[in-house]
Structure formats: structure tokens, C-alpha cells
Amino acid sequence: MQNSSPVSSTPDALPDSQPDSQPDDALRLGPVQAAQRLVLLHGWGADADDLLDLGELLVGPEVSVVALRAPEPHPSGSGRQWYSLQPIDWSALPAARLALRQRLERLAASVALENTVLLGFSQGSAMAIDVGCGLPLAGIVGCSGYPHQGWQAAGALPPVLLSHGREDPVVPFEASEELRRQLLQAGGQVELLPFSGGHGIDPELLPDLGAFVRRCLRGED
């Protein structure tokens, strides 16, 4: 579940990035002191740098962009994972969920969760929806994701925007349809943007994704 960003990104190409308190766990773009933030969760087998260029395209220079690195090494020896998918280890999910929640709460010390949008791709999208729906976030973007086993939407949900390719061979399009169904059933505000394509983020949807993120950060959704 790699190559999710429409443009490549590497840490060496980020001269204006800001060091994180745990530099191996996150990459940053934007001002050190910001009022708003976009947090990025990469997919299975990718790394923190994978979505940075995408994040920069979606928000203005005044917004802090933080790309988190998944805690576990990918079994291929390259990239990272939020939990094992080969084989799927659902028993590791509670710890992964708690670890991500704690990282987001630490980030909230500088930018409030109410002023933060969480965006994830594939496995990162599953984590964003699972953890983010239990936090007072400004919004969530889930790209080519899926619902975790046993997950149920509940409580006061942030606005959610989903995108998914109808021909996705990795995560079936129906997974996002199921997410949409569950979120609507729980009273959430959710939109699903389908596109003709496979497992990725459609460049033609970037204006829609950016508009949603900016509306959420302005408190309009």
C-alpha cells in the first residue's frame, strides 16, 4: 500500500521542515507556532515522508503539517506499518490505537485537536477513522481505507471525507461504502468521493480534498 501521494516526497527535499521532538517518528512542514494543523498517516509499507507533498498541496503555508511515522517496521525491511497485515494481527490493534491517540494528544499541546484535521491513506486511513472518530478533531480525510474489525462509529463525530477508487485491487471500494454507511448510521457528517482508478489518491480530487480540509480548519463543516 505504497506510492499513495500524487507526487514523490523525500526528507532531503524539505529544507524548511521543522524538527520534531522525536525526529524519527514524525516529519514537519510549516511554522513552528501555528494555529491550525494537518496530521498525515501513511499507508502500509510507506513511511512518514510519503504524504508530505500532498499535505503541502492541501493547506496554506500558515498551517502546520505533521507526518507521523508508523511504529513498526514493515516485514519487507522497507517502510513501516501501524500493525501487521501479513498475517493480519487484530490483537495488536488496541495497542496501535492507544499509541496513536497518545501521539495526537501530545501534538494537541501546541495545536488544539479542534484545530486539527487528520488525513490517512489505506492502513493510515483505517487508523485515522478508528482513532479520530473518538477525538474532537476539526475533520478527518480517509483515502482508500477500510473499517477495522469490530469498529463502530459512536459519539460526537468529526466531519469525514472519504475517497476510494472503484477498481481498487488492494482495498475494495465497498470498504469505504461500509465506512460511509456506519458513519451515517451513527449520525455523522460524511461524504464519499469515488473515482475511476485503483489503490491511490486521485490527483483530480485534490481540489475537493483541499477545500474540505480548509473548511474544517475554518470551522465551516
Residue ranges and their predicted role:
Residues 20-115:
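Serine-hydrolase catalytic machinery in alpha/beta-hydrolase-like enzymes
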Residues 155-160, 186:
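Short, proline-enriched alpha-helix->beta-strand connector loops that line the catalytic pocket
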Residues 53, 130-131:
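Active-site signature of alpha/beta-hydrolase-fold catalytic machinery across serine-
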Residues 162-164, 168:
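Short beta-strand/loop motif that positions the catalytic acidic residue
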Residues 3-30:
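A short loop-to-beta-strand scaffold at the N-terminal edge of the catalytic core in hydrolase folds
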